[in-house]
Each structure stands twice: as C-alpha cells, then as structure tokens.
Design a protein with these regions (language model features):
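Sec-dependent N-terminal signal peptides
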Residues: 3-13
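Generic structural signal for short, solvent-exposed loop/turn connectors between secondary structure elements
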Residues: 1-3, 156
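A conserved hydrophobic position in a structured secondary element of the catalytic/binding core
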Residues: 164
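Cell wall/extracellular polymer interaction/catalysis modules
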Residues: 17-159, 167-187, 196-248
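Hydrophobic transmembrane alpha-helices
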Residues: 191-193
Length: 248
C-alpha cells in the first residue's frame, strides 16, 4: 500500500518569489489591506525582536486544545531551529479532546496538518484553511462522511473550527501572507489535545484510555511534542497505511 509522506523540514527550504508577489495579490482585497494597516508594524516589530527577517520568514504553528492556545514559531529560512515568537489565545473551539472522525461531530481535528489556503472573503472576516481530512483522517475516519472546511478564522463562534477573534486573525493572517511571500511552500500545523508533558499525557491515557483510536494518535503526537521540545525542529512525519504515523 502507498505510504503518504509529509516532511515538514524539507518544505521549509529557502526559495524565491516572482516579482508579482503573493503579498501584492493579497493586498487587492479590502480585509487584507485592513489587516496590514492595523498589524503590519506589530508583525515587523515582533519578528525583528526575534532576529527574524520578513523577507526570509518561515513559520510553524502548534495548537493546544485544552489550553486554547496557538503557538507561532518562526525562523529565517537559512536557520536550523525555530523560536517561539507569539502565543495567540483561541477564543472558541468546539468539541472535546480527541480526533475528528466524521462530519458534524463538531470536533476540532487533532494531528499533523498544514495550511492549504487563505480566504480574504470569509464569513468570519478572514480565514485560514486547514488541510483536513489528512491522509490519516481519510483512513481512520468514517468513509464518505469525513467532513471538511476546517478553518482558523475570525469571530468567536466555533463549529469544529478555531475561532480567534477578528483582531487576532488579522495578525495571524499577515504572518501567513508574509511567510508565503518569502517563499515558504507549506506552513505546518500540529494540533494537540493539550500540552503533552509526561504528566498530562499520563492523565489523558488514564481518563480516555478506552478510546483506542485517540490513544494511538496521542502516542504519535506525544513523540512529535517531545522531539520538537528538544530540538525546536518540526519532526518528519510519515502517514502509514493503517492511519498511524512514523515520527522522526
């Protein structure tokens, strides 16, 4: 069977953009111009404070559902490791810990994802699309009823999405535009049930151990969490034929 591969470090290599830049195209939209008017200076100051150039920007996102926090890590494309540059509180997310396995279950997904698009016309001001379902979801979820359209967006209402507020989505959207404009091909996003310290992971297994599907996923996420905490480099992740992952 085919093994699906997502190699986040490889996709973070430096590359150039054409003169018709991604930023210029995005600035054709009113809400993106509003986001830049209110957040560009903040973004520039934050990156400069961490010695990261917007012209060489690479970002990586981690979400912790229980804590309702999104971390944004950044580096220059020539750097080897990421630095934590911003924590965004999540205003609302529906569901409980555990993976999303079918449509209309109101669950926020968990696992290894990437950003698959930016929407400047969102019903929720601005939105950032998550590539749910990923290869694992397609194998382990309810076939033909997986659901889709999972976004990080404005407002403070969630039906399986990550609602950030309009103010926070403006800033996050600008970071994403800048990363794409600097040549990043894929922005990695890992969604955890919680910050997976040894104690928290043990508690999850104790409280939810009967949910074998979630336990398998959490084991893979725990390995990813520990590796990143140690190296500050997103691990390489292979999606295996049974829907589990090889994390290195």
């Amino acid at each position: 069977m085919r093994i699906f591969i997502a190699l986040f470090p490889i996709l973070l290599l430096c590359s150039g953009m054409t003169s018709d830049t991604f930023r210029e195209k995005q600035l054709n939209y009113t809400r993106v111009r509003e986001a830049y008017a209110s957040k560009e200076k903040i973004v520039e100051k934050t990156l400069t404070g961490h010695s990261v150039s917007r012209d060489n920007l690479r970002i990586y996102l981690r979400v912790f559902k229980t804590e309702k926090i999104m971390e944004m890590w950044a580096k220059n494309c020539s750097d080897s490791v990421f630095s934590l540059v911003k924590e965004f509180p999540i205003c609302d997310l529906s569901g409980d810990v555990g993976a999303k396995r079918r449509s209309r279950d109101l669950q926020v997904p968990e696992g290894f994802y990437h950003i698959s698009g930016l929407n400047p016309y969102s019903k929720y001001y601005l939105s950032i699309k998550v590539n749910y379902p990923n290869a694992s979801d397609s194998i382990r979820g309810v076939r033909k009823h997986l659901g889709n359209n999972i976004f990080i967006h404005g407002s403070c209402i969630s039906s399986g999405c990550l609602a950030m507020t309009d103010d926070r989505i403006r800033e996050l959207y600008v970071y994403c535009v800048e990363a794409y404009n600097a040549g990043q091909e894929e922005i990695g996003l890992t969604i955890f049930p919680a910050r997976l310290s040894d104690a928290t992971y043990s508690n999850l297994l104790s409280w939810y151990g009967r949910y074998k599907d979630d336990v398998k996923l959490w084991g893979d996420l725990k390995k990813s969490y520990d590796l990143f905490e140690k190296t500050k480099i997103p691990p390489a992740v292979k999606f295996l034929p049974d829907g589990t992952h090889d994390v290195k």
